[in-house]
């Protein structure tokens, strides 16, 4: 019963559950005198105007959802910053919507910088006491809304990100440093709103949903501003010598000073409207209805992707699965087979010296498969790891899937080499003609990654 079809369908249910257009549409209601957005009410007057600003992997679909619910007479402007790869999915957005693109391969570029300048200009132009700025924020927003602090240039900021990623930095660590190298992140975008108010509807792509770190928190005034000691601790924990960093980056971080941010925080509201938990619940409901004893183990899976892959192999090869590393602290009760174990979160990859092409999900599944070369499964199993954005690393694959039928030793002899070279994408492209790749195309959203492990008796 542990079939690939069930796992693939469960992953599709995840994507449907976090579809951005419907989520935003459900968060907004309007009557002649009152606008309700999430849990916040706005009394409307004849002078009330709304400016919609969307950025992130879900920006186009989120903007569609907002425009579905808002009267055109209220809308003063809609501006969207979307990933370059999403060109062509903007159908149904009205002609008065301005769409800008950038961040190819999820890295900031000059198009991102230009688009950010445009957003700042629009905020300044439309700011008034009767203006509501509706921000629609999703994963990938950090690369799309980018404005390096002087004297930094974009190349120096990119080099810093590259160094941190090569040292296995988490999204939390990356975004903390990004905030300190930016003129818009960490609540600094709100400095441009002098008179109006703002509300942000946010799709979380960060473990634990810390609103101040999602897309690097451009609309969130930090409760406690970071000091240079926090920054230094991050670099030390990643074993990054400051001398590795570009000189301007090193100087900006070392001379970090307290930012001047707006003091009247009641004008600025932030609400998380979707997260990894939404996706996991949808998968669990589907698998339960399909006859599986389904359990959401965690939505906070983190760590090195290759090491986590080995731990999934441990579950697959242990008869008593609750003693395995990933499950021993979960208070899990396994009563009846078949079993569906669901995980969510975001892992990291330590790149080899001359890395190939891949992503954390493809690497996790490859590591699991590689570990199973020398171990015998204790269950019939199917294991999937995939990113909800449809793009695992700089590749066109969301992830990969394996099951018992993939284990003949003669077809796996070179798996270790691909793993050591951080080249998981090319392994899965070649292995069985690419049949194990999960190829969804860009989903238009991002709520981190999903792992599904189905187990049945042999």
Curated annotation (Swiss-Prot):
InterPro entries: GK-like_C_sf, GK_N_sf, MOFRL, MOFRL_assoc_dom, MOFRL_protein. It comes from the Eukaryota. One of its GO terms (cellular component) is cytoplasm. Gene3D superfamilies: Glycerate kinase, MOFRL-like N-terminal domain (3.40.50.10180), MOFRL domain (3.40.1480.10). GO terms for molecular function: glycerate kinase activity. Belongs to the glycerate kinase type-2 family. This is Uncharacterized protein C13B9.2.
């Amino acid at each position: 019963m542990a079939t690939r079809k069930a796992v693939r369908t469960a992953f599709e249910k995840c994507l449907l559950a976090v579809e951005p257009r419907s989520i935003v549409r459900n968060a907004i209601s309007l009557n002649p005198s009152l606008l309700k957005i999430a849990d916040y009410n706005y009394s409307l007057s004849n002078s009330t105007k709304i400016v919609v600003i969307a950025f992130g992997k879900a920006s186009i679909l989120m903007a569609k959802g907002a425009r579905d619910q808002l009267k055109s007479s209220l809308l003063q402007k809609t501006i969207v910053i979307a990933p370059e790869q999403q060109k062509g999915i903007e159908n149904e957005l009205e002609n008065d919507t301005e769409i800008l693109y950038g961040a190819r391969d999820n890295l900031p570029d000059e198009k991102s910088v230009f688009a950010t300048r445009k957003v700042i200009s629009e905020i300044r132009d439309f700011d008034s006491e009767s203006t509501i700025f509706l921000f629609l924020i999703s994963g990938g927003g950090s690369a799309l809304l980018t404005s390096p602090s002087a004297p930094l240039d974009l190349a120096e900021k990119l080099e810093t990100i590259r160094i941190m990623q090569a040292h296995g930095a988490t999204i939390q660590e990356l975004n903390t440093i990004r905030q300190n190298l930016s003129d818009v992140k960490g609540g600094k975008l709100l400095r441009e709103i002098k008179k109006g108010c703002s509300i942000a509807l946010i799709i979380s792509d960060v473990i634990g949903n810390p609103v101040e770190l999602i897309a690097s928190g451009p609309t969130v005034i930090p409760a406690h501003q970071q000091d240079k000691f926090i920054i230094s601790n991050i670099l030390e924990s990643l074993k990054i010598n400051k001398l590795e960093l570009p000189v301007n980056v090193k100087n900006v971080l070392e001379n970090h000073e307290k930012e001047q941010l707006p003091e009247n925080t009641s004008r600025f509201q932030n609400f998380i409207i979707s997260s990894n938990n939404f996706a996991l619940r949808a998968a669990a409901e589907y698998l339960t209805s399909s006859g599986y004893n389904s359990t959401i183990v965690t939505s906070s899976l983190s760590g090195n992707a290759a090491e986590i892959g080995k731990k999934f192999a441990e579950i697959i090869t242990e008869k008593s699965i609750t003693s395995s590393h990933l499950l021993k602290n979960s208070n899990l009760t396994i009563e009846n087979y078949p079993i569906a174990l669901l995980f969510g979160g975001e892992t990291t990859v330590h790149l080899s010296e001359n890395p190939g092409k891949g992503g954390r999900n493809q690497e996790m599944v490859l590591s699991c498969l590689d570990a199973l070369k020398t171990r015998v499964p204790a269950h019939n199993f199917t294991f999937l790891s995939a990113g909800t954005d449809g793009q695992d690393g700089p590749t066109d694959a969301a992830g990969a899937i394996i099951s018992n039928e993939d284990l003949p030793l003669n077809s796996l002899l070179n798996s270790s080499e691909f793993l050591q070279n951080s080249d998981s994408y090319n392994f899965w492209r070649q292995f069985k003609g690419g049949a194990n790749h999960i190829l969804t195309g860009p989903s238009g959203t991002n709520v981190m990654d999903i792992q599904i492990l189905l187990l049945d008796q042999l």
